[in-house]
Amino acid sequence: MHIRGTMSRVPTLASFEVRYKKSFGHKFRDFIALCGHYCSPIKKYIFPNFIAVHYFYTIVLTLITSILLYPVKNIRYIDALFLAAGAVTQGGLNTVDVNNLTLYQQIILYIICCISTPIAVHSCLAFVRLYWFERYFDGIRDSSRLNFKMRRTKTILERELTARTMTKSKTGGTQRVSRPGKSDKRDDFQEKLFNGEMVNRDEQDSVHSSHNSRDSNSNANTNSSNNNSINHNGSSGSLDDYVREDKADEVEKYHGNKSYSSVGSSSNTATDENISQKLKPSSLRFDESQNKRKRTGAPSEKFAKRRGSRDITPEDMYRSIMMLQGEHEGTAEDEGPPLVIGSPTDGTRNMDNGSESKSAPTMNESKIRIQDKGAKISLDQDSVLHSSNSSACTSDEDSLPTNFGGTTPSLSAKPRESSSGPIAFTEGENADRKQGPSIQFNITKPPRKASKSKRVSTMDDLNPRSIFPHQKKSSKGYIMKHLPKARRIRQQIKRRLSTGSIDKNSSSDALDRGLISGLNDDDDGNEGDNMEEYFADNESGDEDDRMQQSEPQSGSELKLKQQQQHQLQQNLHRMYKTKSFDDNRSKPVLMERSKTIDMAEARDLNELARTPDFQKMVYKNWKAHHRNKPNFKRRGWNGKMFEHGPYTSDSDHNYQDNGNNSNSIVHYAESILHRDNSHRNGSEDVSSDSNETTYPLNGNNDHSQNDANGYPTYNDEEEGYYGLHFDSDYNLDPHHALSSNASKNYLSWQPTIGRNSNFLGLTRAQKDELGGVEYRAIKLLCTILVVYYVGWHIVSFVMLVPWINLKKHYSDIVRSDGVSPTWWGFWTAMSAFNDLGLTLTPDSMMSFDKAVYPLIVMIWFIIIGNTGFPILLRCIIWIMFKLSPDLSQMRESLGFLLDHPRRCFTLLFPKAATWWLLLTLVGLNFTDWILFIILDFGSTVVKSLSKGYRVLVGLFQSVSTRTAGFSVVDLSQLHPSIQVSYMLMMYVSVLPLAISIRRTNVYEEQSLGLYGEMGGKPEDTDTEEDGDCDDEDDDNEEEESHEGGSSQRGKSKKETKKKKKRKENENPNEESTKSFIGAHLRRQLSFDLWFLFLGLFIICICERDKIKDIQRPNFNVFTILFEIVSAYGTVGLSLGYPNTNQSFSRQLTTLSKLIIIAMLIRGKNRGLPYSLDRAIILPSDRLEHIDHIEDLKLKRQARTDTDDPMTEHLKRSISDAKHRWDELKHKRSLSRSSKRSTKTN
């Protein structure tokens, strides 16, 4: 074939360009990025963190609002600035009556208040982080969607497999049990290698079994047929005997000598031990002759005599090294089966039986010879080892294996035949090998899964002389275990997956059912076992092979068997030609799954789950079977809610599929994975690890529940949106967290989570995936926040506007103040929900002290608009999580928000912190309410109201005192102690929310300046000082006790203090919750107190004349302090001044008003998080640096505690209190007993 010397570069297809049109959002993001680029110096030095930005936003918005209010010229500018500051900060203090403002000014205050509330500000921060995610992570929207589809596909597959495995484990127990006394393979190999007993690592299990069974060889063959015939029925009582007899036959075939047969029925060999370890595909072996093996009476490679470990020649060491290299050497995918070169004397190996050698059967016929019972079998080692799973190999790509007979077929290629011809099977136990050294293909055996098929026992099964049923079952089992597993089939299957050309029509189903009907023509009472044998690669075929060997066969039986095999070959050929590998059988069988995760299978599942067509197929199939079906939930093995599988009893394996395609996807994926594993793993047996311990997945024996169509249902809980996933780097530990809560469904890997949702030790790929999940969670959260904020505004005025228009008495009061009732409803609803505290009526809410409905409605909106917002937000997300569709993208994002809220939003807390916040709010409001009822229930200010109204007024005032600032009674007329309590409540109003924000910070320890191993370092010095003082006190008390003669009392005190010290020193590395809460409180006090007293000091200087004026007794220092605390707490409550409707601030000078404005702005920033908070840091290199520091810090710690510290501290306190109470009771009992004894004496 001539090749041109030059090549043309002219393209065959004309290139064309499609210009990308940017959307409005993309252009807007580009504009923001351009502005940020030019303003980067300002952003870096003037706005280094969120707190600085918040200060700038508050001050600028206050100035803009004042500028918008002043042009009307009906108020002074200082009053406009004061009103603007009150609206921006929700302070609620007014120096003018709001009803005297124009509608324009009222609308400005309305809008400014709505865009400056804490909910609005933090929601804007969430939108900024969402934008920054899209700019920082390239293509995060598409990658997060693809990762979600991959996780969903893997979850569906693993749920199916796990449900079936759990069902089988409940009915049949564990699959593999590790027996005590088993030695490690590596240690056993090294010991026998240097003792001179064995060199080949692959033979260690068989030799180990043979050494343990030398004394029971005489009973092995006699017990074989009986045990096989009994265990063939699946009897649990004789299952171990059957497995041991199976191993005995394999070892006998392996060594070709009865003296090396395996243990009999009385052996204690473990049921899960594989006797014959298969040779590696890369190994090259020379077989020894049969006569030499009989003379030596030892395995193929063994030293002539036992010798010490020091008598090792270089040849022995070289051979051992080569063997170790072969042990770990992998096989490439394109490599074929390895060659096994037998010795020239193997041709005379089988001459003892006196039978003639038979020629290999052709492709259209099969000759089978069954050896007489008790006859000696001596075949090639690899042909025996891999006889049960040998696959046919032909040169034609479309050809199929057409010969399926005999118990131990060995695939051999004759030297004199052409390499292009087909390679025939050598049947019978006496193959002619006189031509010389034979070259054999070592067909690797796929992993063998233990099978526990349960069938109804019949007399035919129990009769060892019933030959024909076993022959039929053996042929079918042998056929199903020899389906084509070549590389070209895998490639065709993968090509079908990638192109989405999977045949799901009824024709393929009919063809598949036709095939299975052909397989089940001769029923022997175990329908569906063939499918299980094919997919699970169980050991039932070996059992049938032995049963075939136990009885002779006549010519008619052989002829009938050949006809059956020919018919099966045609069915298989049709199935292979149509590429119908779906498992849509009429009677699918529950496959037995291993409790361990194969790493190679996990990698295949990861690749398969990323295929788009396979994802669509799996999800469409799953969705079709979960539409409009009830969920039956039940407590499972780990205490969690999980859904049981579709199998309700042991005998219900052959359930009716009703034409559904529910399990076909799982069978399809399993069949691909099993075929891939058979070639990838070579001769490695996954279940052959003798030291592997399998734990039962379910301790109870409750029958599972299923839906109407027999399909398993699932439902996830809030605290565990769980699912089982494959991870190539994941090692299943028996004591791993998977036993109690599985890997999170929003991640494809098992995360290591530290304190406050801090993910540790992430790789770049894991960070990208976690960033995608966090991005989608923030995106959903932004939608929820907008609906929450706008929706509750709408609900609030919808509830108040109709009421004020229907109540003529109250509408007349509003009209008398010059305000429309409808506008009053809108304004009051906004003021209550945003905690502004300003009303359009000059006396606040005093005119509505008997209006029950608006007071109750306003109580609700005051709470959910400020301190109760995090509680209600988490409740809404939890309800949405419960109602969201299973395996949906929304459910995944909601689950992430519930598990890791502080990574996404500053005002969304974990479950424990939310409960603590709720208890704190209820406790504070209840305390104020009780104090009002106790101290002012009979005062003159509420004497005109009935008792019921007094209780309601007290409740409304206690709720408004902490946040809103509405007044339903004249506060100056209340009891002085109530005024003091209200002032304290105004100061601590924001503390529960602020402490919750800061103690749930992901970087809480770094924000407090703690970089060591102990979290309680701020109080370590105090502890040491206290300890020194205790030592001094102990010494002094001891001296006094000796001087005063009361040494016993001093010793008891000393012992109790030593016990306290011992308790403190028991857990030196334990994080101190009190130190964290104390550090937060100390920081807050250091932030607040000096500024409060500085403002009070300046105002007292400015108002000294008014304070000293005797004619103005209400102008005093306490009233000024009450006003300052109200402004600093952004509450808006005021004691007022006699004969005025405005706040007390109206009586202050201009400079004092500026101090109050500064208090409002400073107090607005009290509830903000620290500058080092993950929820306010944008994705950048700085964030990665902080994460790196956190990883290094947590790696030095002995453990990471993910429990809520406040809850743990409360539990420890309660346990300590109980312990002290028990000690006190014990001491009292001892003292009483001593007194009684003294009285009796």
UniProtKB/Swiss-Prot annotation:
Single GO biological process annotation from the record: intracellular potassium ion homeostasis
Membrane topology: Multi-pass membrane protein
Keywords, comma-separated and alphabetical: Glycoprotein, Ion transport, Membrane, Potassium, Potassium transport, Transmembrane, Transmembrane helix, Transport
Glycosylation sites: 100, 223, 227, 233, 257, 274, 353, 364, 389, 442, 505, 538, 584, 660, 681, 691, 741, 925, 1141
Pfam family, one: TrkH
Disulfide bonds: none
Stretches for region Disordered: 162-241, 253-316, 329-570, 677-714, 1011-1073, 1222-1241
Low complexity composition bias: residue spans: 215-238, 561-570
Compositional bias per record (Basic residues), positions renumbered to this chain: 446-455, 482-497, 1050-1062, 1226-1241
Cellular component GO terms held in the UniProt record: plasma membrane
InterPro entries for this protein: Cat_transpt, K/Na_transp_Trk1/HKT1, Trk1_fungi, TrkH_K-transport
PANTHER family given in the database record: HIGH-AFFINITY POTASSIUM TRANSPORT PROTEIN-RELATED (PTHR31064:SF30), POTASSIUM TRANSPORT PROTEIN DDB_G0292412-RELATED (PTHR31064)
Cited function: This protein is required for high-affinity potassium transport.
Protein name according to UniProt: High-affinity potassium transport protein
UniProt source species: Saccharomyces uvarum
Encoding gene per record: TRK1
